[in-house]
């Protein structure tokens, strides 16, 4: 593998937005897989007020080599002024799965 595998978390306001972003990430090879997890509640401070919103979580499997493009593309597609985009390195995992992530992100073979 030529770069670190990552899991990226991104929350969305609804299922349709989440699926649109997920499909774009996979179609553009910025992610090998995106899990769309509905039914979350986020509690946060925004403009001095405590907010509580239903959200949908994207769990994006990708590589550090394409992360800058993935982050920029999420900003292009996401309706939030400050979308949650958090990338975490995958420290260990199934070698076959990690190789699959590498094979399905970046330039097509």
Model-derived features: where do they sit?
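Positively charged, small/polar-rich N-terminal and surface patches that mediate targeting and assembly
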Residues: 1-109
């Amino acid at each position: 593998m030529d770069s670190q595998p990552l899991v990226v978390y991104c929350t969305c306001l609804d299922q349709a937005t989440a699926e649109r972003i997920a499909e774009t990430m996979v179609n553009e090879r910025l992610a090998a897989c995106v899990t769309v997890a509905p039914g979350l509640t986020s509690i946060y401070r925004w403009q001095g007020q405590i907010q509580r919103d239903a959200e949908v979580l994207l769990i994006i499997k990708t590589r550090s080599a394409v992360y800058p493009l993935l982050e920029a593309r999420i900003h292009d597609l996401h309706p939030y002024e400050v979308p949650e985009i958090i990338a975490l390195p995958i420290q260990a995992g199934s070698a076959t799965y990690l190789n699959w992530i590498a094979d399905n992100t970046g330039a097509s073979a």
